[in-house]
C-alpha cells in the first residue's frame, strides 16, 4: 500500500489530533509535578543540556511524535540529505551544508563525487589568504596593511556571518586575535548602509569581500560597484585588484568587475544561501577578522552536531526533539510563533539569522509534491537577548498570545564581572532571570494566590497570569567558537526536521523571486521617468501608479545623468 501523499493523512497524525484534547485540559502546573516525566524530558550531549519538560506534552505525546517521525520517514530523509540525494527537488540539487564542516578525510558525495576535497581546497586557500592579510604580507595599493574588512552580501550571505561575528567579538581568544582589526557587513542597498559602513574607514587600509554566487545579485552588485568607486576614486582604478576579493563561482564576471579571479573563493550549488555561513561566505571574512584557527573550531563545533544529528536515536537527538516539538506546537497546538531568547548578549544576532533559516526554509504552503497543505506549517521567529526582551515584548508572552519560547543560557560568561559587596555577580543576575522566566510562563499566578498576598480586588484580573505557556531551556557550558558552531547546527537541523515531517521542501525559496521580478518593472519605469521624462505607465495598478508618481514628483531634482556622488559622512 502506498504511503499517504500528505503527513496529515497518516494514522500517527490522526492519533496526535485525538490526543490533543487531553493535553489541552492538563495544565503545566500538573505536568511539572511529575518528577519522572520531567526527568524523561531532559537530554544531554557534549555538555549541552536540553530541558523540554515545560512543553505542553506528556511522555505519551512524545511517543506519538516518534511514530509521526517514523511515518514521515524522518530517518530516511536525514540519511538522504547526508548521502547527497537531490532532496531539493524543485532545483534538482543536493543539500550538503554538512560537508562544509566535515573533517578533511571524510567522504560526502554529490552526484557520485566526494565534495570534501573541494571544500578543503577552498578552506586551505582561505587560510593562506587570511594569514597573509593578517601578517601584513598581502598589502594594499599604497603599501599599507589591510586592517579593515567590509563584507558585501545580502540574506544568507550576511545574516549568518554577522551572527557568528557578533558571538565571537567578546570571546577572549577571538577578541585577542581581532585586536586592531574591524569587520563590517554591508547588506542593504539603501545608501545609508553604505554611508555607515565606510564611515571612519580609510580606503588604503580596507579590503572588500563581495559575496555573490552568480555575481549578479542586484543589491549586492550595486553596493559592490559603489565601494569600487569609493576605492578607485581615492586610490585609482588599479587599486581595486588589491582591495577587493570575491566569493563567487562566476569567474568571468568577477574578472570583468576588476577582481583577479585568483582572488575568488568558490562555493557550490549544493549550498543554500541561508546555510552558507560555514562556506567561504562566512569563513573568509571571519578568518580575516579572527584568524583561521578560531573559525576552524567553529566548524568543528557544527560538525559535532552534524554527527549527533545523523547518528543519535531520536529520544537522545537534540535537533530531532526540538523539531518534533515545533511541529507539535505549530500544527497541533496552533501556536504560530516562536521566541528565541538567548541569555547572552553575544547571541544577539542569533534570532535574526534563525528567522531567515526557519522562515525562508519552512514558509511554504505546498508539499514537495505540490499539494496544498491542509494544516499550519512554518513559524514566525523573533527574539532578543535576555534581559532586554523582558522589558520589551515579554508582557505579551506572559499575558497575551501564547508563544513558545527557547531560553538559551550559558554557564560561564565570556566576560565575567564581579563587584565587591553585590549580592550576586553580573552573570548570576542575568542567569537568575534565565531560570525564573520559564517557570513564570509555565506556572503563572492564580487569583487565589493573589488574594493570599492581599492584592486589591480590582487589580486581581490584571495581575493574574494564566501560565501553561510552553518553553524549552538549553544550557551551554561556555560560548566559544566551538559552542557557537554547535548552536548554529542545532537550529539548522531542527528546521530540516520540521520540513521533513511536514513534507515540504525546506531548501528552496521561490517566494523571494516574485518581488524581484516586479522590482525589475519598477526599475525600468524609474529609469524611463528620470532619463526620458516618461509618465508612469498604465501597467501599474492605481495604488502603485499613485505612489510612484508622488515619489518621482517629490524627487524631481534628481539629475537625469548625475555625476558620481558618494556618501558624505565622517
From Swiss-Prot:
It catalyses: alpha-D-glucose 6-phosphate = beta-D-fructose 6-phosphate. Its EC number is 5.3.1.9. Keywords: Cytoplasm, Gluconeogenesis, Glycolysis, Isomerase. It is an enzyme of class 5 (isomerase). The active site is at 360 (proton donor), 391, 516. Pathway: Carbohydrate degradation; glycolysis; D-glyceraldehyde 3-phosphate and glycerone phosphate from D-glucose: step 2/4. Its main location: cytoplasm. InterPro entries: G6P_Isomerase, G6P_Isomerase_C, Phosphoglucose_isomerase_CS, SIS_dom_sf, SIS_PGI_1, SIS_PGI_2. One of its GO terms (molecular function) is monosaccharide binding. Homodimer. NCBIfam families: PRK00179.1. HAMAP family: G6P_isomerase. Belongs to the GPI family. This is Glucose-6-phosphate isomerase, cytosolic 1.
